[in-house]
Amino acid sequence: MAAEDELQLPRLPELFETGRQLLDEVEVATEPAGSRIVQEKVFKGLDLLEKAAEMLSQLDLFSRNEDLEEIASTDLKYLLVPAFQGALTMKQVNPSKRLDHLQRAREHFINYLTQCHCYHVAEFELPKTMNNSAENHTANSSMAYPSLVAMASQRQAKIQRYKQKKELEHRLSAMKSAVESGQADDERVREYYLLHLQRWIDISLEEIESIDQEIKILRERDSSREASTSNSSRQERPPVKPFILTRNMAQAKVFGAGYPSLPTMTVSDWYEQHRKYGALPDQGIAKAAPEEFRKAAQQQEEQEEKEEEDDEQTLHRAREWDDWKDTHPRGYGNRQNMG
């Protein structure tokens, strides 16, 4: 029974070839990346490559103590497993887990590049880890402009990688049919897989550079969201209730609110008072009695006569005073103190 189970388990070559084939199908698929068909291939390929990686670890097929020449030509292709894992991880579509997918894909690419660097597959510089990149960014944050020399060197490196990648793809396409059909000798097979390793070194370096840029953008977006959320939470707090200082309360009790706050009479009292004097709107102008008219006329006549008499007397006194001043000049009669 155990022997039958072992026969049913997929072997390492089958896991590797199926995973590689699924990756090729995903890369050339015409359907949207988020479609169900494409995502099923992505998940299935990741599962197969994960099993292949576990099997490689159990078999201890590669060791850092050995050189590249000591690895069998047919086993060189299994060094590509981490690179395939990183490429398929990048194909996952889930916006809420995008940052996790990017970090996991970066780990796979770094694992692949580390193996190739240890075996001296090609001459290249390993990318910095995320912690070193963060420290480097913090140290260089005070620089207003990047170094022109560094920018030029990065551009030149990208151009060189692109040319090398195109050349490798051309050579691989020429050797593919012979190797896969089994007609190539061991030397050609070894050269074919070494070219594959070099090609995926260039791809991994480009992917890591793109991943670092996207991770930076996502983290800045998350930090801005947190800042906006904290600001909105402050704005959504209930308004502060108005408060009155004790001093103002005591002052209002003594001096009042600035206007008569207590009534001096009721509405009924006001109505009776105005009704008594006939000043209500519906009462019209109050009518005076005939006796009152007669008294008012008599008082007016007496006042006019009095004013006329007062005027005559005043005029007479003024004329007498003028005559006296004409006959008595200033200083008249003051003769006692004269020498």
Swiss-Prot record:
One of its GO terms (biological process) is negative regulation of transcription by RNA polymerase II. The modification N6-acetyllysine is found at K241. Phosphorylated. It comes from the Eukaryota. Ubiquitously expressed with highest levels in heart, skeletal muscle and pancreas. Keywords: Acetylation, B-cell activation, Chaperone, Cytoplasm, Intellectual disability, Phosphoprotein, Ubl conjugation. It is linked to Intellectual developmental disorder, X-linked, syndromic 28: An intellectual disability syndrome characterized by agenesis of the corpus callosum, coloboma of the iris and optic nerve, severe retrognathia, and intellectual deficit. Intellectual disability is defined by significantly below average general intellectual functioning associated with impairments in adaptive behavior and manifested during the developmental period. Belongs to the IGBP1/TAP42 family. Interacts with partially folded PPP2CA, but not with the fully active protein. Interacts with PPP2CB, and with PP4 and PP6. Interacts with MID1 and MID2. Interacts with ubiquitin. This is Immunoglobulin-binding protein 1. It comes from Homo sapiens. The gene is IGBP1.
